[in-house]
């Protein structure tokens, strides 16, 4: 969630999140059209004691990318950060599904619903794909389409409907993949 929030805070209009999950690995890609980073910033963002000046009033460090990078390395996964100043950023990472140090997925439906309702989110599309025993499936959550149906994400009733809808989509994912 923190990495997607970085996209929102970087002024992104379009953010695409893809989660591909199989029996052997989990691959996640976050692409945005935010302000992007130069080469120095790309190296610096993996330092836990670096945070962009003025980005946060009360926080002086940015731990999301450094912690993610550390977790990926510990679990034998991969991490790629691509960015160009003025063009946006792509973060792609993977975890081996069966590695002891791969963190648990947790309540993915709640996490995805929270991202969709984030006050800085504009055009957010989340694609969730899975493969298990030769079968493939998935779903797409498009914030714009969900807003057309629900109207807004401020009221508790609409937030509950959003959460229930995302949970219903996630319930279709086979348990051995989750």
Identify what each model region corresponds to:
Residues 67-77:
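Conserved glycine-/histidine-rich ATP-lid loop and adjacent helix of the Bergerat-fold HATPase_c
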Residues 1-18, 71:
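Conserved ATP-binding N-box helix of the HATPase_c
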Residues 50-60:
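Glycine-rich ATP-lid/hinge loop adjacent to the conserved G-boxes
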Residues 37-49:
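Short conserved segment of the HATPase_c
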Residues 20-28:
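Short beta-strand-loop-beta element adjacent to the nucleotide/active-site pocket used for signaling
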Residues 32:
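Acidic ATP/Mg2+-coordinating residue in the GHKL
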Residues 87-89:
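Glycine-rich GHKL/ HATPase_c ATP-binding element in histidine kinases
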Residues 81-85:
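A short beta-strand-to-loop motif within the catalytic HATPase_c
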């Amino acid at each position: 969630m923190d990495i997607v929030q970085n996209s929102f805070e970087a002024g992104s209009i379009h953010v695409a999140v893809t989660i591909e999950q199989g029996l052997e690995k989990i691959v996640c890609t976050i692409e945005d059209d935010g302000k992007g980073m130069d080469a120095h910033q790309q190296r610096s963002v993996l330092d836990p004691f670096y945070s962009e000046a003025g980005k946060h009033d009360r926080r002086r460090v940015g731990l999301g990318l450094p912690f993610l990078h550390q977790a990926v390395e510990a679990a034998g996964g991969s991490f790629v950060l691509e960015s160009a100043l003025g063009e946006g950023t792509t973060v792609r990472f993977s975890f081996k599904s069966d590695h002891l140090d791969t963190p648990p997925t947790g309540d993915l439906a709640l996490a995805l619903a929270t991202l969709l309702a984030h006050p800085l989110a504009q055009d957010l599309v989340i694609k969730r794909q899975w493969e298990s025993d030769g079968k493939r499936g998935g779903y797409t959550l498009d914030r714009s389409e969900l807003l057309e149906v629900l109207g807004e994400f401020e009221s508790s009733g609409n937030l509950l409907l959003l959460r229930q809808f995302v949970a219903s989509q996630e319930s279709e994912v086979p348990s051995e993949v989750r």
